């Protein structure tokens, strides 16, 4: 993101930065590299390969041609991102590793609090007395590797964050999992919201006026950005906000970068009034002003100088008339890398060598959840989303290559790439029951919008091509031998597959329709999965439900959710009824057990709900609109359980469904060439241990993949 020479556009510098990292990291080779492509789905990759849309000699094609491909990789249930990544890292299922959804409640926390599955204690904790478990029921594979003297690097992998985990909402909570268990030799946490949400600005020429003083013109010339028409400045500041303890006043000016004798404004310049337009060069994470040339179709980064969290954002211009009659600007959300004390040196290394945390694809923009976007066309907002797809995967790739540069001979490098998941959620519009206009329930079947479907198919393809480029760049950094085989053992996996969904399900309305008291029962949802928690005395702080009432409530929840059926023939495809839930699993209970309410089994972990339920494929708790939009053919009901969704793709369903299969590729010195019919994602960790000659942790449930290793 550094503009080392301000005459170079940002996209060129990003490419140069990536090339430099590729060159510098190619001289040494890690032993094992695992790359997780969130949401990559075997059937979609095969379709793109069959259509010759994946470039030969790159990424997926190298791995398939020189190594092993599995036709099916059964992940865990629920097939959610945090759940599956912790399963990959531990080689254990969600019950023992205690991460059962992306968001859930620690039973030690107050009844209204939740924790992210990405930051929850792996393998559980001691409930009474509350504290760290010296013998957790699952450990990440880096625990055994580091004990054996191996070098491990995690680049935004779930669980590798250097966090001291505490119980949310509990005053004076002890550390229930120390940072040491979540820290490796080089640990890069996944980024976080920096304090300013995305928003749009729709301006016209009336919003601009000539510069009041010539000072800024001189600054722009000094910075290498002269204007060949009169510089126009917004009459009032574009925005003011506070991030990381610092207040910012952002102004925007329009310049004409073409020396053609015609007034045609083509570039917007964003700067902080307190900083002015500085000429540079800038040292990362600093960027100076953001210069956005509309014709590039790309955003520009903007570092928030002085912010305590080292945050930054971006500006994207989605529409710009040469006479400024239409000016549409999308300000991306501010983001940063968490400054966790245990890994602060690694965080600063990324900030100063790669840049501040880039903007990942933000669904709030195309769904118009972010303010100020009502005048923007769908295509404008989709263009902003696609820009973020490119931007963020490029950033994650450079983070991975920087990690490789720091530890070129690491024994294990674990890399996470967010695409194609984000795009599939937004654009997997492939089912005739999906409303192409979320506000119009009639836009299904023959009333779907074919142009929108075609655009969305292109965006999904682009996500896979972008992910493939990331894989290819990392493989090329590892290096290929004379036979074209990667010099390291490279695993490319995903956490889950993907399917379209056509109906949103309201957890809140399930409780209301079922007559449940929300002070006693709550529903914590993640995708198509829900944990129903009961506010049990002696378990939750200030719990109110007696053990006897708990048993009654648990039975009522099970009976009610099992009774929910979809009877609308437009959505049941010829069946009279379709159960809304495929899996409904209660926590085992024994009224005489001193650990009543903490019992576990092969599906229910310590912090899972008292009833865990998984929706039938095609239904999803996410996507409920406000106000709710009733489906075509359903009764008009503002509190309906089933409704029209505002996006299209989902995962988290039963992992035995073929479409939920993750991908699995492997190639390298220790990998055979061939095809495997079936692998399991919990087998990846012990297979890596085998390659590195380390005995797996005794909590590992997976086994070495048969037929993979030489």
Model-derived segments and spans:
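A long, amphipathic alpha-helix that forms part
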Residues: 383-413, 429-490, 554-565, 683, ...
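Bacterial N-terminal signal peptides
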Residues: 13-23
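A contiguous, mid-domain pocket- or channel-lining segment that forms the substrate-recognition surface
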Residues: 127-379, 392, 396-414, 418-438
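Beta-strand elements within well-structured catalytic alpha/beta cores of enzymes
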Residues: 30-45, 62-64, 88, 145, ...
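Metal-dependent active-site segment of extracytoplasmic phospho-/sulfohydrolases and closely related
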Residues: 59, 463-509, 572-588, 592-594, ...
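Active-site nucleophile/metal-coordination loop of metallo-enzymes that catalyze phosphate/sulfate
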Residues: 42-147, 158-181, 251, 258-260, ...
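Active-site neighborhoods of enzymes that stabilize oxyanions during catalysis
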Residues: 137-139, 202, 207-326, 333-334, ...
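Acidic/histidine-rich catalytic neighborhood
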Residues: 472, 485-544, 551
């Amino acid at each position: 993101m550094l503009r080392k020479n301000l005459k170079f556009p940002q996209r060129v510098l990003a490419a140069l930065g990536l090339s430099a990292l590729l060159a510098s990291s190619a001289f040494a080779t890690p032993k094992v590299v695992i790359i997780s492509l969130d949401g990559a789905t075997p059937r979609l990759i095969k379709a793109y390969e069959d259509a010759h849309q994946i470039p030969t000699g790159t990424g997926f094609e190298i791995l398939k041609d020189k190594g092993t491909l599995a036709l099916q990789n059964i992940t865990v249930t629920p097939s959610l991102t945090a759940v599956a990544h912790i399963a990959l890292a531990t080689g254990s299922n969600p019950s023992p590793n205690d991460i059962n959804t992306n968001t859930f409640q620690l039973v030690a926390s107050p009844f209204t609090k939740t924790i992210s599955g990405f930051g929850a204690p792996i393998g559980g904790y001691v409930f009474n007395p509350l504290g760290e478990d010296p013998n957790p029921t699952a450990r990440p594979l880096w625990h055994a590797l580091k004990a054996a003297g191996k070098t491990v690097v995690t680049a935004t992998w779930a669980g590798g964050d250097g966090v001291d985990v505490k119980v949310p909402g509990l005053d004076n909570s002890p550390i229930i999992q120390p940072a040491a268990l979540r820290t490796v030799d080089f640990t890069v946490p996944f980024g976080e919201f920096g304090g300013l949400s995305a928003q749009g600005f729709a301006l016209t020429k009336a919003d601009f006026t000539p510069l009041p003083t010539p000072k800024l013109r001189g600054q722009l010339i000094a910075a290498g950005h002269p204007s060949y028409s009169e510089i126009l400045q917004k009459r009032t500041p574009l925005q003011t906000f506070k991030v990381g303890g610092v207040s910012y006043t952002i102004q925007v000016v329009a310049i004409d970068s073409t020396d053609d004798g015609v007034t045609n404004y083509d570039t917007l310049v964003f700067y902080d009034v307190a900083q002015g337009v500085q000429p540079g060069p800038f040292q990362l994470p600093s960027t100076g002003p953001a210069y956005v040339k509309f014709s590039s179709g790309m955003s520009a980064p903007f570092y928030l100088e002085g912010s305590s969290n080292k945050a930054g954002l971006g500006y994207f211009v989605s529409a710009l008339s040469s006479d400024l009659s239409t000016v549409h600007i999308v300000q991306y959300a501010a983001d940063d890398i968490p400054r966790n004390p245990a890994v602060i040196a690694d965080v600063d290394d990324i900030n100063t060598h790669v840049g501040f945390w880039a903007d990942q694809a933000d669904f709030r923009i195309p769904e118009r959840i972010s303010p100020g976007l009502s005048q923007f066309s769908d295509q404008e907002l989709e263009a902003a989303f696609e820009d973020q797809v490119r931007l963020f995967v490029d950033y994650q790739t450079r983070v991975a290559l920087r990690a490789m540069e720091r530890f070129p001979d690491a024994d294990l490098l674990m890399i996470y790439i967010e695409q194609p998941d984000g795009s599939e959620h937004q654009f997997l519009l492939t089912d005739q029951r999906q409303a192409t206009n979320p506000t119009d329930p009639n836009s299904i079947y023959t009333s779907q919008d074919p142009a929108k479907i075609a655009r969305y198919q292109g965006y999904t393809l682009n996500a896979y091509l972008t992910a493939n480029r990331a894989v290819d760049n990392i493989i090329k950094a590892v290096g290929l031998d004379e036979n074209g085989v990667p010099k390291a053992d490279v695993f490319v996996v995903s956490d889950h597959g993907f399917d379209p969904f056509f109906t949103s399900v309201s957890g809140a309305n399930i409780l209301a329709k079922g007559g449940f008291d929300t002070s006693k029962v709550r529903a914590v949802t993640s995708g198509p999965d829900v944990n129903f928690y009961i506010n049990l005395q002696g378990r939750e702080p200030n719990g109110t439900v007696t053990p006897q009432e708990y048993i009654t409530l648990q039975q009522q929840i099970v009976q009610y959710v099992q009774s929910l059926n979809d009877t609308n023939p437009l959505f049941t495809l010829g069946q009279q009824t379709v159960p809304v839930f495929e899996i409904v699993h209660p926590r085992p209970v024994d009224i005489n057990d001193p650990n009543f309410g903490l019992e576990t089994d092969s599906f229910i972990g310590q912090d899972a709900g008292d009833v865990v339920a998984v929706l039938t494929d095609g239904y999803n708790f996410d996507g409920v609109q406000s106000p709710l939009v009733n489906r075509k053919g359903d009764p008009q009901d503002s509190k309906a359980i089933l409704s029209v969704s505002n996006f299209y793709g989902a995962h988290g369903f039963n992992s035995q469904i073929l479409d939920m299969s993750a991908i699995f590729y492997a190639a390298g010195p220790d990998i055979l060439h061939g095809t495997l019919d079936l692998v399991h994602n919990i087998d990846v960790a012990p297979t890596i241990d085998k390659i590195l000659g380390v005995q797996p942790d005794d909590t590992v449930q997976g086994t070495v993949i048969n037929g993979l290793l030489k």
